[in-house]
Protein backbone atom coordinates (compact mmCIF):
# COMPACT_ATOMS: atom_id res chain seq x y z
CA UNK A 1 0.00 0.00 0.00
CA UNK A 2 1.47 3.31 -1.09
CA UNK A 3 1.04 6.45 0.95
CA UNK A 4 2.39 9.97 1.20
CA UNK A 5 2.62 12.64 3.86
CA UNK A 6 1.56 16.06 2.60
CA UNK A 7 1.47 19.50 4.17
CA UNK A 8 -1.70 21.52 3.77
CA UNK A 9 -3.25 24.20 5.93
CA UNK A 10 -0.28 24.20 8.30
CA UNK A 11 -0.83 20.53 9.13
CA UNK A 12 0.77 17.29 7.98
CA UNK A 13 -1.60 14.58 6.73
CA UNK A 14 -0.88 10.94 5.80
CA UNK A 15 -2.83 10.21 2.60
CA UNK A 16 -3.48 7.07 0.56
CA UNK A 17 -4.98 6.84 -2.95
CA UNK A 18 -8.70 6.04 -3.00
CA UNK A 19 -9.49 7.53 0.43
CA UNK A 20 -10.94 10.91 1.39
CA UNK A 21 -9.67 13.32 4.02
CA UNK A 22 -11.02 16.44 5.72
CA UNK A 23 -8.44 19.23 5.42
CA UNK A 24 -8.39 23.01 5.81
CA UNK A 25 -10.51 24.97 3.34
CA UNK A 26 -9.17 25.00 -0.24
CA UNK A 27 -10.17 27.64 -2.78
CA UNK A 28 -11.55 25.10 -5.26
CA UNK A 29 -15.07 24.23 -6.33
CA UNK A 30 -16.61 20.78 -5.71
CA UNK A 31 -15.69 18.18 -8.39
CA UNK A 32 -12.60 20.23 -9.26
CA UNK A 33 -9.18 18.54 -9.51
CA UNK A 34 -6.39 19.87 -7.27
CA UNK A 35 -2.67 19.11 -7.22
CA UNK A 36 -0.71 19.30 -3.98
CA UNK A 37 3.03 19.68 -4.47
CA UNK A 38 4.14 19.98 -0.83
CA UNK A 39 4.89 16.27 -0.36
CA UNK A 40 7.13 15.50 2.62
CA UNK A 41 7.38 11.69 2.33
CA UNK A 42 6.45 8.97 -0.16
CA UNK A 43 6.29 5.23 0.61
CA UNK A 44 5.81 2.65 -2.15
CA UNK A 45 6.27 -1.12 -1.66
CA UNK A 46 8.46 -0.67 1.40
CA UNK A 47 10.71 1.95 -0.23
CA UNK A 48 10.53 5.20 1.74
CA UNK A 49 11.67 8.53 0.28
CA UNK A 50 11.97 11.43 2.69
CA UNK A 51 12.25 14.98 1.38
CA UNK A 52 14.52 17.68 2.72
CA UNK A 53 12.09 19.38 3.22
CA UNK A 54 10.06 18.33 0.14
CA UNK A 55 10.32 15.28 -2.12
CA UNK A 56 11.45 16.44 -5.56
CA UNK A 57 9.15 15.32 -8.38
CA UNK A 58 6.34 14.13 -6.11
CA UNK A 59 2.76 15.40 -6.32
CA UNK A 60 -0.61 14.29 -4.99
CA UNK A 61 -3.72 14.63 -7.17
CA UNK A 62 -7.16 14.81 -5.64
CA UNK A 63 -10.76 15.76 -6.28
CA UNK A 64 -12.71 18.14 -4.06
CA UNK A 65 -15.85 16.31 -2.95
CA UNK A 66 -17.51 19.10 -0.95
CA UNK A 67 -17.03 21.92 1.52
CA UNK A 68 -18.39 21.61 5.03
CA UNK A 69 -18.00 23.01 8.52
CA UNK A 70 -16.35 21.20 11.41
CA UNK A 71 -17.67 20.60 14.89
CA UNK A 72 -18.38 23.62 17.06
CA UNK A 73 -15.67 24.53 19.55
CA UNK A 74 -16.92 26.53 22.52
CA UNK A 75 -14.72 29.14 24.22
CA UNK A 76 -15.86 30.26 27.65
CA UNK A 77 -14.10 33.10 29.45
CA UNK A 78 -15.00 34.13 32.95
CA UNK A 79 -13.62 36.48 35.58
CA UNK A 80 -14.36 35.24 39.08
CA UNK A 81 -16.30 37.54 41.45
CA UNK A 82 -16.94 40.09 38.67
CA UNK A 83 -19.98 38.58 36.85
CA UNK A 84 -18.07 38.84 33.58
CA UNK A 85 -18.67 35.94 31.25
CA UNK A 86 -18.11 35.48 27.52
CA UNK A 87 -19.19 32.44 25.58
CA UNK A 88 -18.18 32.17 21.93
CA UNK A 89 -18.35 29.38 19.39
CA UNK A 90 -16.26 28.64 16.32
CA UNK A 91 -16.74 26.23 13.41
CA UNK A 92 -13.80 25.66 11.08
CA UNK A 93 -14.37 25.58 7.32
CA UNK A 94 -13.28 22.18 5.94
CA UNK A 95 -12.78 20.70 2.47
CA UNK A 96 -13.37 16.98 1.90
CA UNK A 97 -10.69 15.82 -0.56
CA UNK A 98 -10.62 12.44 -2.34
CA UNK A 99 -7.05 11.38 -3.17
CA UNK A 100 -6.93 10.06 -6.74
CA UNK A 101 -3.23 9.31 -7.17
CA UNK A 102 0.30 9.94 -5.96
CA UNK A 103 2.91 10.74 -8.63
CA UNK A 104 6.56 10.07 -7.80
CA UNK A 105 9.39 10.31 -10.37
CA UNK A 106 6.97 9.73 -13.25
CA UNK A 107 5.33 6.71 -11.58
CA UNK A 108 1.62 7.09 -10.85
CA UNK A 109 0.47 5.24 -7.73
CA UNK A 110 -3.30 4.70 -7.61
CA UNK A 111 -5.70 2.75 -5.42
CA UNK A 112 -6.12 -0.95 -6.20
CA UNK A 113 -9.20 -1.72 -8.26
CA UNK A 114 -12.24 -3.28 -6.62
CA UNK A 115 -12.23 -6.29 -8.98
CA UNK A 116 -8.70 -7.26 -7.91
CA UNK A 117 -9.66 -7.05 -4.24
CA UNK A 118 -12.75 -9.23 -4.68
CA UNK A 119 -10.79 -11.80 -6.70
CA UNK A 120 -8.29 -12.13 -3.84
CA UNK A 121 -11.08 -12.41 -1.27
CA UNK A 122 -12.99 -15.14 -3.15
CA UNK A 123 -12.20 -18.57 -1.64
CA UNK A 124 -10.88 -21.23 -3.99
CA UNK A 125 -13.50 -23.99 -4.36
CA UNK A 126 -10.95 -26.78 -4.77
CA UNK A 127 -9.09 -26.00 -1.55
CA UNK A 128 -12.35 -25.43 0.36
CA UNK A 129 -13.59 -28.94 -0.55
CA UNK A 130 -10.49 -30.61 0.91
Swiss-Prot record:
Q: Name one Pfam family in it.
A: Ribosomal_L21p
Q: Could you tell me which SUPFAM superfamilies the record lists for this protein?
A: L21p-like
Q: Which UniProt keywords apply?
A: Ribonucleoprotein, Ribosomal protein, RNA-binding, rRNA-binding
Please give the Gene Ontology molecular function terms for this protein. rRNA binding; structural constituent of ribosome
Is Thylakoid a UniProt keyword of this protein?
A: no
* Signal peptide as annotated in the record: none
Q: Name one GO cellular component term.
A: cytoplasm
| Cross-referenced InterPro entries | bL21-like, bL21-like_sf, Ribosomal_bL21, Ribosomal_bL21_CS
Organism domain of life: Bacteria
Any one GO BP annotation for this protein: translation
| Annotated family | Belongs to the bacterial ribosomal protein bL21 family.
Function recorded in the entry: This protein binds to 23S rRNA in the presence of protein L20.
Under the subunit heading, UniProt states: Part of the 50S ribosomal subunit. Contacts protein L20.
Extract the PANTHER family matched here. 50S RIBOSOMAL PROTEIN L21, LARGE RIBOSOMAL SUBUNIT PROTEIN BL21M
The entry's protein name is Large ribosomal subunit protein bL21
What species does this protein belong to?
Answer: Trichormus variabilis (strain ATCC 29413 / PCC 7937)
Q: Which gene encodes it?
A: rplU
